Amino acid sequence: ILDSAAKIAFNGVTVRDADLGDLTIDMALNHVDGETFNQLIQVYNESAKQQHDELTDEEVQITKKFIDTQPQFIFNPTLSNKAGKLASNLDISMASADFENAIGQGKIFSLFNHFIFKMDANKEALIEEAATVLQLDRLDKEQATKEATEQVNLGIKNGVQQGILVEDGKSVKLDLVLEKGELKLNGNVIPEEQVASMLFLLVMSMGQ
């Protein structure tokens, strides 16, 4: 069983000469069975050469075998600009690869040991990023900042009203945590049946 971690830093991320700030990414892949992981990489490398549109049976089986080893994946990106930071944290620990039974029985949460997604974004940093992107559309800085402020404030307002986001002073946050069989969004419990129904509708819409 292997644990691995990496940190990547990009100083001065630019798009068409526009400075979006500095990006750092902390990643980890823990509780990994080395042999199974090597098989997974080999199968997907071979499949990439064939350019299949859909997953092959071999890919499905090796993916399930890998997930059944209960790996943990951590992905924490942070973007910093002159106004502040935009940070998020994704931490997923798998428990089972029996997707068919889990979805069929409405036991979605049983697939995970835990699932954590958190976001903490400085509002001024959000506006700064949005304004920089809008300036790529040839808006001047003043107009871009005005539009960015309106868009960000409206997005935050709608997110707060829907219970997706929480305003905390100068920051906006999102906290989605699944632990011990209970899913909470910003502290509010989301029933497993509701999640199962949403996933079912999503799968049905993708099949059309």
Predicted regions and their residues:
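Glycine-rich, small/hydroxylated-residue low-complexity segments
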Residues: 1-208
